[in-house]
Amino acid sequence: MRFYAVGLNHECTSLEQTETFALSAEEQEALYANLSLSADAEVVVLSTCNRTEAYLYGTEADLRQVKALIGQGGGTRWPEETAFQERDEAAVRHLLQVTSGLRSVVLGERQIFAQVKAAYERAVDAGGIHSVMHRLFHTAFRAAKRVSSETGLGRGAASVSTAAVEMARQDLSEAGGEGLRNTEIVLVGAGKMGRLALEALADESLASLTVVNRSPDRAREVASPFGGDTEPWADRHRAVATADLALVATGASDPVLHAPALPAPDEATLVVDVAMPRNVDPAVDERPGYRLYDLDDLEAWTAEVRERRADAVPEAESICEELLEDFVTWVFHQQALQPAIQAIRSTFDTIREQEVDRHAHRTGMDREEVDRLTESIMQKLLAVPIVRLKNVDPESIDFVQGIELLHALFAPSDESDAGRSLAEAPDADTPDLGEAPSRCPYMTHDPGGDGTETEEVQKALRLSAAHQAASHSEEVRGG
């Protein structure tokens, strides 16, 4: 079992190829439904306007299956020659940097955080992830929050949409106008990217603002807070022809603006397509009176933004490296713990089953009822020790010695002399994690690292204390 990050993005391939493999929310759900990964494998698929990537904890066979299914979604085979692939620490580093905006077209943009979070939540709903990926993605979220609050990486244009507005402002100014002042603007699409664009335009003195969407109600909902009007979807080509600037960002998988359908513009019209896949027929750029920019043009324009923010990159990367180290330490911690925890549970369960076999017939209870009762008792007795064990500092000498002692005490006799050293962790560059650890129900999803116990731990401790008090009371009455 290894960590993998694979995919296509603006760093390794062209916009045309990336959009071929773009997956809608429905296509991602279908991909999860069609996956048949090995036991304990976990995967999250991310598809945005600039990247389609998969983050996997699994085997090479699992990886081949994920790539094949993404390829099927694009109607072709997986492009091994242009796609990127990272594994283990490099894969974890890639996810942390993507989530923090370090790998975005607009360096430091914050929209990617919401997109990664949505991808994570979609995978959770599909049952695609368990303890390891839960921990990994919440580590990525912590990295993004710290980079945003502790560095200057996100200053200025904060998303693809806002960068598109800034690029349009510069283009219109260079064309002899007043930038965005007194312009007539049409927004085609009323999704998240469109709303972000309107927010970037909120303080501008526009001549007019019109929103066009397939759903008239949705168009009114988006336009109303900004004092905008709406036009029917069927009139979108005419609306664009009357505008100084058209921003296009729908969720369609095919172009929604077609060159032959566009009337000659009243004046020069700038069309900015920020959708993936592209929503505007490339032939629009050849029509007299129209200028078309897409994500490739935006990437070139944002090179200046990246240069201005370059000073913040080392600090942001340092934060990612710090949290990467924390995550790898946690993985090794879980890997070292797992044999000891399994040995403890196995020993207790063997004793439980032996005693049930000996005494179940005396209770008058059904065997299944006795099994459930004794299993519940065993889990409650082990809850606090196991939670305490998982909270021990993995870098302490006591941790290593304690784990070896526990394994020696509880390992089956045929394993006790196997000479296995739990103090030996895998090499940090190749964290081959073996079997994934079972999810600990007492671990918070976003641990703060402040040493405080979760509500579940406190509940387990209260139950243990109550049990001890009851036992003491019985002893007092009996004495």
Curated annotation (Swiss-Prot):
InterPro entries: 4pyrrol_synth_GluRdtase, 4pyrrol_synth_GluRdtase_dimer, 4pyrrol_synth_GluRdtase_N, GluRdtase_dimer_dom_sf, GluRdtase_N_sf, NAD(P)-bd_dom_sf, Shikm_DH/Glu-tRNA_Rdtase
Residues that, per the record, bind NADP(+): 189-194
Pfam families given in the database record: GlutR_dimer, GlutR_N, Shikimate_DH
Record site feature (Important for activity), residues: 94
Active site (UniProt): 49
Region (Disordered): 417-455
Keyword GTP-binding: no
EC assignment: 1.2.1.70
Binding-site residues, substrate: 48-51, 104, 109-111, 115
Family from the record: Belongs to the glutamyl-tRNA reductase family.
Subunit-level organization: Homodimer.
Other comment: During catalysis, the active site Cys acts as a nucleophile attacking the alpha-carbonyl group of tRNA-bound glutamate with the formation of a thioester intermediate between enzyme and glutamate, and the concomitant release of tRNA(Glu). The thioester intermediate is finally reduced by direct hydride transfer from NADPH, to form the product GSA.
Name of the protein in question: Glutamyl-tRNA reductase
